Each structure stands twice: as structure tokens, then as C-alpha cells.
Amino acid sequence: MNIDFHIKPEIRILGIDDSALLNEKVMIVGAVFRGGDWIDGVLRSEITKDGLDATEVICNMIKKSKHYDQIRTVILDGITYGGFNVVDIQMLYRETGIPVIVVMRSYPDFEKIKSALKYFPDGEERWTIIKRAGKIERIPGEKSPIYIQRAGIGVETVKKIIRLTSIRSNIPEPLRVAHLIATGIILGESRGKA
């Protein structure tokens, strides 16, 4: 069920991104924001590189957080973390009760993804999770569009949240800051784009 709801200017949003893939364990960082310009907290956990634990780890990270009852939306940087550790956004929504928005700078190349998944013994399972994430929708931006998937939230509400939180680029600030923190901690300095 995807619903639209009223957005307050200081809605609590959790943006999640991963760090560089330097080890078997990959750090994921969550930045808790009020709207798009006030950071309220930082969450951290680890997932297995190319594993299948991202959904469970993110669920636990959220549920164990002191911010859990305040978070109204989770924003993910794509659905693959730590290589091909795929997040099941429908399950993440069901387990936490918090709507999920997936943000992508460009439309995914599904043929390339399917080709890469052939090297995984559980590639079909990963592909099923990817398909379960649902339709990819284009959201126009000032300079360039972004692409989204969603669970438990209507597209009009997603557009409002994107507008509210995308204050320095077309990427929502909670996601941009999570990326900066994750790469900065692991690489010693932040780099790349969320």
C-alpha cells in the first residue's frame, strides 16, 4: 500500500549509504535529519560485502535507534549496498513500518545487472528482490531528473520530500550527508557522489 501523507517542514528522515568496499565487512551510515537542513543524529552498522544481510542489518539499525519512533521516511541510495547486497525495500517497510524511498541518479541498466548476477550462486534470489522493489519512476529536478522506487508511500509525497530535502543538489540532503560521513570515515576523506 502506497499512501500520501502530510509533510511537516521538520519531518524526520533517515538517509542511508554505504562506504567504500575495502573489506569483507562494509560500513553503512544513516544520517537522521529534520527536513533537509538539520542533522539530528548518525547511525552506523556493517553489512557483508556481496552478502544478503543488508535488509536485516538496516532493519535492526533502525529499530534499535533512539530515533526509531520519530523517523517518518527512510531514503536509500539505490537498493544494492556493499557490492550486490540487495535491500528488500518491501520487507524493510513491513518490518519497520516506515515508508522507504530509493533514490538513483540514473536509470539502472538491468541487462548489466542480470549479467553480473550470473556469477552468484543465489543470483536468482537477488534478482527476485530487485524486481520486488517495484517500478522505477522519473522525478524531474531543476538540473537533472532522479529516479525513484518506493514502498509504503505515494509518489506525490515522495516529490514533496525530495523538494524539501534537496537543498544543495538534486540528491536529498540526508542521503548526501550519509555518503560524506561513510566515505570520510573509511577513506580518511569524503569523495564521490551519493
UniProtKB/Swiss-Prot annotation:
Pfam families: DUF99. Transmembrane segments: none annotated. Belongs to the UPF0215 family. HAMAP family: UPF0215. This is UPF0215 protein Mbar_A0619.
